[in-house]
Amino acid sequence: MKRYSDSKPISSIIRREEKTDPKPEYQRGPVWSKKQKQLLIDTILRDLDIPKFYLRAVNNGNYEWEVVDGQQRLRAIWEFRRSEYKTSKDAESVGETEIANLAYSDLPEDLKDKFDSYALNLVILENATLDEVEEMFVRLQNGSTLKAAERRNALPGK
């Protein structure tokens, strides 16, 4: 397995949504609350740091990437970009700009640009076997709230 770091703006990740598998077999489904999604978007709009995303490079005809770690964050970004939910009703201004209770489509152009150009830190895994990816997934999730059954399902051969 080869691992390398990369950085891509959100706009690039948005364009690759159809080529990205957010839920390979070892992943759990979407579980983030609206409040968690809103906090992530607020963090991005304030240009604060978020954890890196781990993606497995695949070439299976359907997808180019599988999400190893960061699925919940990636889904939240995609959904906000499609204006499927709004920022928090009590979100504080970003600079002089009010952002409370706004969908992406309602943001002023400068904040749309800021959101779209926000750099996501990626770790790309190339030539990784399913066993290697599942092992990495378990290790990355070790400190999170994965349930015992989810952890068992992620183990190779389960």
What function would you assign to each model-found segment?
Residues 13-15:
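N-terminal intrinsically disordered, low-complexity segments enriched in P/E/S/T
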